[in-house]
UniProtKB/Swiss-Prot annotation:
Keyword Hydrolase listed: no
Function statement: Component of the CENPA-HI complex, a centromeric complex involved in assembly of kinetochore proteins, mitotic progression and chromosome segregation. Required for the localization of CENPC but not CENPA to the centromere. It however may be involved in incorporation of newly synthesized CENPA into centromeres via its interaction with the CENPA-NAC complex.
Gene expressing this chain: CENPH
GO MF terms, alphabetically ordered: kinetochore binding
Organism: Gallus gallus
Keyword S-adenosyl-L-methionine attributed: no
One cellular-component annotation, GO: nucleoplasm
Family statement drawn from the similarity comment of this UniProt entry: Belongs to the CENP-H/MCM16 family.
InterPro entries (alphabetical): CENP-H, CENP-H_C
Keyword field: Centromere, Chromosome, Coiled coil, Kinetochore, Nucleus
Name of the molecule in the record: Centromere protein H
Compartment(s): Nucleus; Chromosome, Centromere, Kinetochore
Residue ranges, annotated region (Disordered): 1-23
Superkingdom assignment: Eukaryota
Taxonomic placement: Eukaryota, Metazoa, Chordata, Craniata, Vertebrata
């Protein structure tokens, strides 16, 4: 299809105009290239004949070299501009040839129209594909942002839970410690009171001069009073 399209375009009057314009374009490009090559050669000859470290640079030579370099840059700019304009002209000639060829309404013209329709359809599909890809990328970026925020919120929530549990454990530990201290103080107090009562009872029995050894009940009481009051003995 591409070969038939090129043949149909090349056989039109626009192609003849393009072919006629080609020699002038080639001649101008060759002239610019020759001028550029000549200027390069002149600059190299001046640099070789009079190196900067030998101190032989006169004002005229330096000016000529600078002028040659500027001219060389201008030639490059002109060449680029010429190539751009030539490309634009070729596009215009091609469009004009296509228009004229389509007006003939023959088999080649219909082929050109169908090809152009296919190209337009493909371009439209490419644009739609780019739009869909952009939407997918935006959705993917949104998902990544939401995932990042969820991870951040999850980390903050886990930290809050850990801090709350640690504080609760600390409060429970402090309460247990306070309760144990309270129980210990009560036990010490009860132990002192019990020891005092033991001493009082022992003194009473001894002061009454009772033969407690003959009485089993008194002997058991005396032996019990002589024991050290502790939690293990109480148990």
């Amino acid at each position: 299809m591409a070969g038939r399209l090129s043949e149909s375009v090349g056989s039109g009057p626009g192609a003849e105009a393009e072919t006629a314009a080609d020699p002038d374009a080639k001649r101008d490009v060759l002239e610019h290239l020759c001028a550029r090559t000549h200027l390069k050669q002149l600059v190299m000859e001046f640099d070789t004949a009079c190196p900067p470290d030998e101190g032989c640079n006169s004002g005229a030579e330096v000016n000529f070299i600078e002028s040659a370099k500027e001219t060389l840059e201008e030639v490059g700019k002109v060449k680029s501009a010429f190539e751009s304009k030539a490309l634009v002209i070729k596009r215009i000639q091609l469009m004009d040839a296509l228009r004229k060829r389509v007006k003939e309404n023959d088999g080649c013209a219909r082929l050109i129209v169908e090809t152009m329709r296919d190209i337009i359809k493909l371009n439209w599909e490419i644009i739609q594909a780019h739009q869909q890809a952009r939407v997918i990328r935006e959705n993917l970026n949104d998902i990544r942002r939401k995932r990042y925020f969820l991870k951040q919120a999850e980390g903050e929530k886990a930290l809050r839970i850990f801090t709350t549990v640690r504080k609760k454990k600390e409060v429970v530990r402090m309460k247990i410690a306070e309760k144990l201290k309270f129980i210990h103080r009560n036990v010490q107090y009860e132990r002192k009171v019990t020891t005092l009562v033991q001493n009082i009872l022992q003194n009473i029995i001894v002061g009454c001069q009772i033969n407690w050894a003959k009485d089993p009940s008194l002997r058991a009481i005396i032996l019990q009073l002589e024991k050290d009051i502790s939690i293990q003995n109480l148990l």
